[in-house]
Amino acid sequence: MYIAPADATLGEAEWRPFVEATGFGHLVAAGRNRDVPVVVPTQFLLEGDTIRLHLVRANPLFAALAENRRVLLSVAGDWAFIPSAWKTIGVEDPELGIPTTYYAAVQLTGTATVHDERHEPGGVADVLRRQLQALQPDIAVADPAVAHPRQIQSILGITIAVDSVSAKFKYGGNVDEAHRLAVVDHLQARQGPGDAAAAGHVVRRLAPRPPDTSNPRPH
């Protein structure tokens, strides 16, 4: 995706919490010599540099993975439409404002490994356990390998070793602080879906912060 300099991520400390909190995205597998890639909406778990998820065995994604294990997970959210008049302040003509959409988007690229209980006992169950522990840590569940042996045969686990991250946070970084704060006021007043999250990103990205000294993957 195209990332303007003003929208570039501030680093892993910014994109990782967004990806972990969202927890849902679209997994894209190009396969080989296909007219279009296979795209699957899915829940996922990001642990370190590894993505874990599971899909029904009949999912067409697995045919694409058999051709090419390289995949991309696209995660987007916290979006809000910004009307043209919101982009102007003071004596500026509201009719000349340029509307836009604020949003966050992260693309994680890596190599997928498929786990099949028929050939790797415990592989799918491990993915399920990790996902459930993250999604409902306070709710006890039976061990899937023991309680649901037949059902677990109908799904396959996927782990993705992430080696590249591209992240974009489009929240008015191309305009000055006064114009961005004016948009925040409008978002807080409108209180529509996504408005609070978008306003939070604008304010957070205005705050001065030390440079990211971690060892983030390419983005």
Question: Which functions belong to the PLM regions below?
Answer:
Residues 52, 72, 109, 157-161:
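Beta-strand secondary-structure signal
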Residues 29-33, 41-42, 61-62, 94-97, ...:
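Catalytic micro-motifs at enzyme active sites that drive phosphoryl/nucleotidyl and oxygen chemistry
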Residues 22-24, 68-71, 155:
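Short, surface-exposed beta-edge/turn micro-motifs
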Residues 1-52:
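An N-terminal domain-cap segment
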Residues 58-127:
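Short, structured beta-strand-loop surface elements
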